[in-house]
Amino acid sequence: MDRQVKGILGAKLGMTQVWDNNRVVPVTVVQAGPCVVSQVRSHQKDGYAAVQLAYGAIDPRKVKKPISGHYTKADVAPRRHIVELRTTDAAEYSLGQEVTVEQFPAGISVDVTGKTKGKGYAGPMKRHGFHGLRASHGVERKHRSPGSIGGCATPGRVFKGTRMAGRMGGVRYTVQNLTVQAVDTENNLLLVRGAIPGPKGALVLVRTAAKAKKGGAAK
């Protein structure tokens, strides 16, 4: 990845709304960081440039010994979560450095990655938005069924990837080009326009947008 990436781990607190030029803007509040740098990778030693961020308090007794040794080597207290970001400016970071929300000014575009809410086993109407069958006129107790998934002779099989009922949610998902509405550096809060994946309290990764629109933040 040949670009500079700023990132931070945090927890989704929930949604609220703020006023902006007499308009109501829905925002998601993220308790972002502070994170600590636990490792810096370089082209000379590792073959690529990256920075490793650690986040979240944890009882040191619950940390496995290999991971505990990793933190001891970096001379930082153990954290619950670790993420690695490939960035060209990794050499500018140092072990033990604290990363806060100050690197995300208001108006910047960001990508937010998290794990979506798990919905369990769901039918095609809920999972894929199928219209369903008619309410009457010959339809018999099959109103929410998917319909045909493949003819008996042609094609004589079910194609791979056919949308059917199954487990819904609980997957890694990234929402791109969200705008940072406001930043609270005292309380380590990011207010991001729109919704982000996951329930309240879910772990999220906020990064500078990979496909940011030219001329500033995405509208």
Curated annotation (Swiss-Prot):
Query: What superkingdom heads the lineage?
Result: Bacteria
Gene Ontology cellular-component terms for this entry are: cytosolic large ribosomal subunit
An example Gene Ontology biological process: translation
Is tRNA processing given among the entry's keywords? Answer: no
UniProt keyword annotations, A-Z: Ribonucleoprotein, Ribosomal protein, RNA-binding, rRNA-binding
Record flagged with keyword Disulfide bond? no
Kindly give the Pfam families that the UniProt entry links to this protein: Ribosomal_L3 (PF00297)
**Quaternary structure annotation from Swiss-Prot or TrEMBL:** Part of the 50S ribosomal subunit. Forms a cluster with proteins L14 and L19.
Summary of the function given for this chain in its UniProt record:
One of the primary rRNA binding proteins, it binds directly near the 3'-end of the 23S rRNA, where it nucleates assembly of the 50S subunit.
Q: What family classification does the UniProt entry report for this protein?
A: Belongs to the universal ribosomal protein uL3 family.
Q: What is the protein named?
A: Large ribosomal subunit protein uL3
- The protein's organism comes out as Salinispora arenicola (strain CNS-205)
Q: Supply the gene name.
A: rplC
